[in-house]
Regions:
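Cytosolic juxtamembrane N-terminal segment immediately preceding the first transmembrane helix
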Residues: 1-37, 42-43, 51, 55-76, ...
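Cytoplasmic membrane-interface "Motif A"-like loop-to-helix N-cap segments
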Residues: 108-120, 349-363
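Glycine-rich segments within core transmembrane alpha-helices of 12-TM secondary carriers
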Residues: 176-202, 216, 333-337, 427-440
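Helix-loop-helix hairpin linking two adjacent transmembrane segments in secondary transporters
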Residues: 186-234
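Hydrophobic core of transmembrane alpha-helices in multi-pass small-molecule transporters
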Residues: 126, 140-157, 298, 380-410
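C-terminal ends and interior cores of transmembrane alpha-helices
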Residues: 121-138, 363-377
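Cytoplasmic helix-loop-helix junction between adjacent transmembrane helices
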Residues: 145-188
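Extracytoplasmic gate region of multi-pass secondary transporters
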Residues: 42-44, 287-342, 398-403, 439-440
């Protein structure tokens, strides 16, 4: 009897449910990678929009009236260019934060496939419109601000929808590890966005936006044709979101050994109730832990997004790299973020303490940020090492809160399997965090003219505040480890 080929054996060793779950992970990973890929170019292009023109060789046939700004792109050729960059960032981030609070409620009530597809197509349009300003020779600040604001609104379609989709397919077992790996799409998108933008930034910076815009629009088409929102839509088995016991400590993990690609279904899976109404905004706020983690993410995301938008310019100004080199070097921060997100998920799965894991990483991040500012420019090896460490410690808690914590709270035991709370809870947490994401780059734009030291002091303060906001949850988790019974709210 002839044996099956090894590849076929591998394929048949997994169940139909497992292959669908795997495909959902891959698809949603690609979708949100494209979202972040389309956000990153602005941070790379900043150092091209305003340069030190005295070091640039100008064409012989060009009539130059101002030797200091002839190579800059108006209106960013002014002395207050850093403030203008801050305004530009804020147009996107304020619109994103505002829209996020409503996006979750739309996501609960609209088909996720249509919602995501339309969001990605519109994001591609507005990203490309920013780059077309180069070819259309647009020098109006209002044009770029309007495009950024509209892009910020449509980009809110992404996060609540992909988290809700993954939450529909995966139960609580090993959720931190699965989502820690899956959440690397944020850093992968930032890295790809930096590299793609870096290819065109010195020659035709408009393509730094147009190419990512085309990519995210194409992923929107893929989403429309291939996304499956729920296991029930294709007759797959829904996941188990809760333990069978009556009481569940706040954000403690199941001790069951649920496998990612299990080919057998447990008989202990509780039946999924068919809720006809999505959870209300106020109802989501009453879920234990939502307020604390939302406020913590506000400050954690403030730090992360300040790096996202200002790190290439900081490296270019302080370490004196050209725009492409600064953009390439800044990707190391995101490489560290990938490792940090996976480690945060693993540690929180093993310990059962989501809040404690976030708290520990944030408290270590504060002195590391201080060191980065002091010694981060002392040679390339030091810069690389500090970027990796700071990326892991800053983005680790941010990744854990926006993925595993959001999914845990969105399928909390008090909801009894109502996964229609997932999108709203995720939107509340990420929307609150996005307020910090809007404030951070704006403050950096206002503070940076007084010196980069002051920017880092602001970031360290935000890190410490994020730690303090988790203190109550950390205390409850530690008491649980010591054998005390935690009393649930709600």
């Amino acid at each position: 009897m002839r044996s099956l080929a090894p590849g076929i054996k591998l394929i048949t060793s997994f169940s139909r449910d497992s292959w669908y779950r795997f495909s959902i992970l891959i698809l949603t990973f690609v979708f949100y990678t494209s979202y972040h890929l389309s956000r990153k170019p602005i941070s790379i292009v900043k150092s091209q929009l305003h340069r030190n023109c005295s070091n640039v060789i100008h064409p012989a046939d060009l009539n130059i009236t101002d030797n200091d700004t002839w190579c800059d792109w108006a209106p960013f050729d002014q002395n207050n260019y850093q403030n203008l960059f801050g305004v530009l960032d804020n147009c996107f981030l304020v619109a994103y934060a505002f829209g996020m609070f409503f996006s979750g409620m739309f996501g609960e009530r609209l088909p996720l496939r249509y919602y995501l597809s339309s969001g990605m197509l519109l994001s591609g349009l507005f990203t490309a419109l920013f780059g077309l300003g180069f070819y259309w020779r647009i020098h109006s600040l209002w044009y770029y601000c309007l495009v950024q604001a509209l892009n910020g609104l449509v980009q809110t379609t992404g996060w609540p929808a992909v988290v809700a989709c993954v939450g529909n397919w995966f139960g609580k077992g090993k959720r931190g590890f699965i989502m820690g790996i899956w959440n690397s799409h944020t850093s992968v998108g930032n890295i790809l966005g930096s590299l793609i933008a870096g290819v065109y930034v010195s020659s035709a910076w408009g393509l730094s936006f147009i190419v990512p815009g085309i990519i995210i629009a194409c992923t929107g088409v893929i989403c429309f044709f291939f996304l499956v929102e729920k296991p029930e839509d294709v007759n797959c088995t829904p996941p188990q979101h809760h333990e069978s016991v009556e009481q569940e400590p706040l954000l403690r993990n199941s001790s069951s050994n649920e496998e990612i690609f299990s080919s057998h279904t447990s008989t202990a899976v509780e039946p999924v109730e068919d809720h006809t109404e999505a959870i209300s905004f106020c109802g989501a706020l009453k879920i234990p832990g939502v307020v604390e983690f939302s406020l913590c993410l506000l400050f954690a995301k403030l730090v992360s997004y300040t790096f996202l938008y200002w790190l290439p310019l900081y490296i270019s100004n302080i370490a004196h790299f050209d725009p492409k080199e600064a953009g390439d070097l800044s990707t190391l921060f995101d490489v560290g973020g990938i490792v940090g997100g996976i480690l945060a998920g693993l540690i929180s799965d093993y310990s059962g303490g989501r809040a404690t894991t976030c708290w520990a990483m944030l408290i270590i991040a504060a002195p590391m940020l201080f060191l980065f500012n002091k010694i981060g420019q002392n040679g390339l090896p030091t810069t690389v090492g500090m970027l990796l460490w700071c990326g892991a410690l800053v983005n680790g808690p941010y990744a854990l809160i926006t993925t595993a914590v959001s999914a845990d709270l969105g399928t909390h035991e008090c909801l009894r399997g109502n996964s229609r709370a997932l999108s709203t809870v995720t939107a509340i947490i990420d929307g609150t965090g996005s307020i910090g994401a809007a404030v951070g780059p704006l403050l950096a734009g206002l503070i940076s003219p007084t010196g980069w030291n002051n920017v880092f002091y602001m970031l360290i303060t935000a890190d410490v505040l994020a730690c303090l906001l988790l203190s109550r949850l950390v205390y409850k988790e530690i008491r649980g480890w010591c054998g005390y019974t935690t009393r649930q709210r709600g």
